[in-house]
Amino acid sequence: MSCETEDLEILKGKTFSRVIRWESTPFLYKAITAITKAGPVVVTATGHGVPDGWRVAIVSAGGMREINAKYSPPRPSEFHRAKKLSSDTLELNEVNSAGFTTYTSGGYVQYYTPVDLSGYSARMTIRDQVGGTSLLSLTTVVENGRIVLDNTAKTITLTISATDTALVTWSEGVYDLEMVSSGGVVTEILAGTITALDEVTT
């Protein structure tokens, strides 16, 4: 997938934390065997393989047409953040299916492939402008430790401590997050602007 764009905010004097999930093609499909009529909805798909917190779309489910993505491939707004209840069940907290038509059969949980993070390191630089002066860096290097990779959960966690954000003197910048493979291949996966706001409570 191409680099995603997201604008971030830091509150000075507060801990900044953001969890990134690196998605890639191809899509994966897991057959559905049951969908509850409840809020939140629970979907059963044996051995779904979906990491907790991953985005999923429901497609081609029989009976409960209301839950299906309308477009193929699904649009970003048709994906829902999934809570992994077990290896066979997922909860979609955003979806209340209590008033939907009863599920009959078929359908798939569709989701992007989670990238294998083994062998990767990560780095993120905040600059005053594109190609400008570095304001702050985040890396997976132990001495820095502001980025943590979890290949089991398939997460990339960015953290800036409250102590460090309190020292921020700039108000706005730009950033990019790069993943570096063991072979030295660099992939930019996220970029955007970042704003540092003054805290209200000290």
Language model features with spans:
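Small/polar beta-strand repeat architecture
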Residues: 28-115, 128
